[in-house]
Each structure stands twice: as C-alpha cells, then as structure tokens.
C-alpha cells in the first residue's frame, strides 16, 4: 500500500489524540501567536507500522501571552518515526512552557524519535521552560 500523506496546519492547539495510521506520513504544523491559560495536551498514537510524524511548532510570544502545552508520542508498534521541532521567539513578558514525552513500548524495534525545542529570548522578562 502506498504511503498516505496528511498535512495539518493550525493557528491554535487543543487537547486531542491523533492516530498516526499505518503506512502514513503526517505533518502537523502549528503557527502560534495567540496564547492560552490552561495546559494543552496533544497525544499522537502510533498503532501501525511504517508511520511517520513531523510535528513543527512556530511560536511568537508578545505582551503577556502564555503557551503551555505538552506533546505525547506513543510508539506501540515497530517501524515508526516521530520528529518534534518547537521554535519560539519570546518578547515582552511572554512565556512558553513545553513538555515533550516520547514513549516506546518494549517490542517496537526500529523506532526513531527526536525532540527539540529552541527559543530566542528577546526580552529579559520573557520565560521559557522545557521538559523533554
């Protein structure tokens, strides 16, 4: 079966569980400029082999905007790939609070997962907090 390609582009995040299908390539792009108060949790469940996810978040924080969120990548089967890349530029008193979890079950061999968060602190009052 040929690879199924999915592209998700959003300007906000919400609590959600996204199934990354067998033989699929999913790209999730978030372009965030408006913050929120309560933490948001997004789960990505890999239940089929040869599934790939690219999660890309661009954050521009201004004023007192807050961006608290968590991603969870559950690799339940072998031969899955996940790449999480969070980039932020924080101005004024803005804050980004990112927690990234990658869970690989004992039997999913040949799984590849990567997570990175890079923030430009463009104000002495801006804050960033990352838990990989």
For each feature predicted by the language model, list its residue ranges.
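Conserved beta-strand/loop scaffold segments within soluble protein domains that form the structured core
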Residues: 1-132
